[in-house]
């Protein structure tokens, strides 16, 4: 069975891993998943990530907890294969009044909504993280 939406699968694995208090979760790797993991690490939502470059590359994301509670309270896919969501620089959303981030795919690469607003770029809204 082929996977229709690998990004949704990644977000679901992270969500389920934190619900089960796992230390880390593994998933098939891709350039976009690695870029999302790098952004989550830079924003402080995960501890670390690593790519095992074997026959089938695998991405391992080390999850982050604070006082035994998951740091990621909510992670939600926005733009999906059946309904792509694009926003220009003026209509980029703020997540939880600025406490969360929106992952935006721009012409300059993947970045948070704050960084995209600062750079004056719009793009595809991949997901919300809070």
From Swiss-Prot:
**A biological process (GO) annotation for this entry?**
translation
- Keyword Ribonucleoprotein attributed: yes
Keywords attached to this entry: Ribonucleoprotein, Ribosomal protein, RNA-binding, rRNA-binding
| Pfam entry (one) | Ribosomal_S8
Matching Gene3D superfamilies: 3.30.1370.30, 3.30.1490.10
GO CC, sorted alphabetically, is: ribonucleoprotein complex; ribosome
- Top-rank lineage group of the source organism: Bacteria
What Gene Ontology molecular-function terms does this entry list? rRNA binding; structural constituent of ribosome
Which intervals of the chain form a coiled coil? none
Q: Which PROSITE patterns does the UniProt record give?
A: RIBOSOMAL_S8 (PS00053)
What family name appears in the similarity comment? Belongs to the universal ribosomal protein uS8 family.
- Quaternary organization: Part of the 30S ribosomal subunit. Contacts proteins S5 and S12.
PANTHER family xrefs? 40S RIBOSOMAL PROTEIN S15A
Q: Give the protein's function.
A: One of the primary rRNA binding proteins, it binds directly to 16S rRNA central domain where it helps coordinate assembly of the platform of the 30S subunit.
Put simply, this protein is called Small ribosomal subunit protein uS8
Give the source species: Vibrio atlanticus (strain LGP32)
Q: Which gene encodes it?
A: rpsH
